Amino acid sequence: MAEYIARRYRVAEDVVTNFVSIAYRAGEKYSLDPLLILAVMAVESRYNPVAESLVGARGLMQIIPKYHPEKLDAHGGEQALLQPEVNILVGAQILREYLRRFGDTETALQVYNGALDEPTAKYSNKVFAEKALLEAMRVKARSKTAQSA
């Protein structure tokens, strides 16, 4: 999977391997599908750990510090957002909170993006499409591994 992501987003494979590993740990910690976390990263930052938006969202999961200060304080403050592990863990924590609060993945994703009132759910559809591609890559990789065994 890391190879696929690295090629598609033109990021070094060893860097992506680290992101994938962190996403799996975050998924386990927050009971989230790691592919959903990876899909959010793809849509939010294209796997750029130093991405910053015009509204101040930062890092892989594009977290806006002013909305989550308590989560960031636990990791040393908002400057920690440029550390991939912190960014992914905090992003996963936020996503988990929204899933609990709203009860479904589509709404949680729309809220994560600040687009709850967007009628076509364009953001969540992008994330779901990316997740489907990652799932296909995972199936392909497993099938390849099984064939070579």
Show which residues each predicted segment covers:
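Catalytic glycan-binding domains that act on GlcNAc-containing polysaccharides
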Residues: 1-149
